[in-house]
Amino acid sequence: MDNYKIAETETFSKKIKSKKFNHLYSKILNDVYPIFRNNPFFGVNIKKLKGKYKEIYRFRIGDYRLFYTVNEIERIIFIINIENRQDLYK
């Protein structure tokens, strides 16, 4: 079985370079992306969203949430956004 490829959206790329999130990027590259390449659907920190966001998954990284979608046909994961948990529920 081929591994999934990872594509970062422009929104995510800009946000991860900001001071608020840049400390997470090495963790995402070294710890999260290897998990995604093997199986982006199942894991302790992976949850599929519901309702109008049912095509989006979220990955928990401590107090932060990484959001992504998966194109199963082309086997590509699109990293959409990252947010601090407390900012999501304001």
PLM features: what roles do these ranges have?
Residues 1-57, 72-74, 87-90:
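Basic, Lys/Arg-enriched alpha-helical interface segments
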Residues 58, 65-70, 75-81:
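Short, hydrophobic/aromatic-rich beta-strand segments within well-structured domains
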Residues 50, 80-83:
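Residue-level detector of conserved, well-ordered beta-strand and adjacent loop positions
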